[in-house]
Amino acid sequence: MKISYDKEIDALSITFKETTVTTKHIAEGIAVDYDSDGVVSGIEILDVKKRLGGNDTFKQVVLEGVGLELAA
């Protein structure tokens, strides 16, 4: 999974897998990408700071149960 933020256009992108997609706009500024089997492969949210409550809220990112493995 890849999470990226483009501060120039204030867009958050979450990619679950890299593949050829069909994009469906589900609401103003929110798009969901589907793979050929209809499984969600990504999500894009525009105007993310406004949607999440501004800079202070957006800066607080919590990863739960991600299962990160650290190299020894």
Sequence positions of predicted segments:
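Small, basic N-terminal interaction modules of short regulatory proteins
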Residues: 1-72
